[in-house]
């Protein structure tokens, strides 16, 4: 069953009428019903197109968090063959919020790392809603080092509200683990590609996203802190999240303009949650293109290009 966001209410009402007419048409199949159904479908498509053509940053935040948006496991199942996950950080334990392993992508070995939020109550609890603890980031570092040793490119699929802020995570060195992850990304001699799938939240995202190429889905967000957290800090009022989202420049369109990301991956009309398979294909094609552009670079060139990319951020604003 499709889940609608608050601002999608006009479209929801139209699609409810369409469903009613489809049921009636299946029973009676009269020309009048068929004609009305065609008109309503066209009206709903136009309404959806107009709505998504002018989304505010706060509305994009809601789309990025949509419960039916495709997650890490969907993309891995969609275009990674023979994926073999590895567990544990060899220091404390395993963290299910970050999944990582090796597989085949278009006939080439690849290391895939990313946050998994979960799709239902049980899986969300298992994966801690994609909020990783230090052992998750240390596991990611271990995988990146393995990939570097064997000359395998790294693909990071980012979807997290941030690193887990619990006391246990702080006790085990959350900040250090995030810093080590960021350093590992920047130090790799193999190409690395990051895709911001939904939320790219703070250090929890950057720890696996400091890559040669950063791709971002059209309605994803990438931010130093959630709009709610920023509103609480700036105005001591979390209800001003909409104002914070507008001020923070968190959308793919703004971040492309500022040179923070390299390419926007288009989503189907109405967002990735309406057509996961098309979204997965679009991400796959974008990753193929990005890897192709880096494939012939030597390890030193890969590091140099990545270094220049990040050092150049902010110089041309």
From Swiss-Prot:
Pathway connected to this protein: Lipid metabolism; malonyl-CoA biosynthesis; malonyl-CoA from acetyl-CoA: step 1/1
Alphabetically ordered keywords of this record: ATP-binding, Cytoplasm, Fatty acid biosynthesis, Fatty acid metabolism, Lipid biosynthesis, Lipid metabolism, Nucleotide-binding, Transferase
Catalyzed reactions per annotation: N(6)-carboxybiotinyl-L-lysyl-[protein] + acetyl-CoA = N(6)-biotinyl-L-lysyl-[protein] + malonyl-CoA
Gene Ontology biological-process annotations: fatty acid biosynthetic process; malonyl-CoA biosynthetic process
Subcellular location: Cytoplasm
EC number: 2.1.3.15
InterPro entries from the UniProt entry: Acetyl_CoA_COase_a_su, ClpP/crotonase-like_dom_sf, COA_CT_C
Chain ranges of the CoA carboxyltransferase C-terminal domain: 39-293
GO cellular component annotations of the record: acetyl-CoA carboxylase complex
Gene Ontology MF annotations: acetyl-CoA carboxylase activity; ATP binding; carboxyl- or carbamoyltransferase activity
One family name in Pfam for this protein: ACCA
Family: Belongs to the AccA family.
Subunit structure: Acetyl-CoA carboxylase is a heterohexamer composed of biotin carboxyl carrier protein (AccB), biotin carboxylase (AccC) and two subunits each of ACCase subunit alpha (AccA) and ACCase subunit beta (AccD).
Alphabetical list of NCBIfam families matching this protein: accA, AccA_sub, PRK05724.1
Main function: Component of the acetyl coenzyme A carboxylase (ACC) complex. First, biotin carboxylase catalyzes the carboxylation of biotin on its carrier protein (BCCP) and then the CO(2) group is transferred by the carboxyltransferase to acetyl-CoA to form malonyl-CoA.
The protein's name in its UniProt record: Acetyl-coenzyme A carboxylase carboxyl transferase subunit alpha
Gene from which the chain derives: accA
């Amino acid at each position: 069953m499709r889940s609608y966001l608050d601002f999608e209410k006009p479209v929801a009402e139209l699609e409810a009428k369409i469903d009613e007419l489809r049921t009636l048409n299946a029973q009676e199949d009269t020309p009048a019903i068929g004609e009305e159904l065609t008109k309503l479908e066209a009206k709903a498509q136009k309404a959806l197109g107009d709505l998504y053509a002018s989304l505010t940053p706060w509305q994009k935040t809601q789309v990025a968090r949509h419960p039916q948006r495709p997650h890490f496991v969907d993309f891995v199942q969609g275009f990674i063959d023979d994926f073999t996950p590895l567990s544990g950080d060899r220091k404390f334990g395993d963290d299910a919020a970050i999944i990582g392993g090796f597989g085949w992508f278009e006939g080439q070995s690849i290391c895939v790392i990313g946050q998994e939020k979960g799709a239902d109550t049980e899986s969300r609890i298992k994966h801690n809603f994609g909020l990783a603890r230090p052992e998750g980031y240390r596991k990611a570092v271990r995988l990146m080092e393995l990939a570097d040793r064997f000359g395998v490119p790294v693909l990071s699929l980012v979807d997290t509200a941030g690193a887990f802020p619990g006391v246990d995570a702080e006790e085990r060195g959350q900040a250090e683990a995030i810093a080590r992850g960021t350093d590992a990304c920047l130090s790799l001699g193999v190409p690395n590609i990051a895709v911001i799938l939904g939320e790219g939240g703070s250090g929890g995202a950057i720890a696996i996203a400091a890559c040669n190429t950063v791709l971002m889905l059209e309605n994803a967000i990438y931010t130093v802190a959630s709009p709610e957290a920023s509103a609480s800090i700036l105005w001591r009022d979390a209800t001003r999240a909409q104002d914070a989202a507008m001020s923070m420049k968190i959308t793919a369109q703004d971040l492309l303009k500022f040179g923070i990301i390299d390419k926007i991956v288009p989503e189907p009309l109405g967002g990735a949650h309406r057509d996961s398979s098309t979204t997965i294909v679009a991400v796959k094609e974008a990753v193929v293109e990005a890897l192709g552009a880096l494939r012939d670079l030597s390890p030193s060139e890969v590091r140099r290009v990545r270094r220049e990319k990040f050092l150049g951020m902010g110089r041309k604003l």
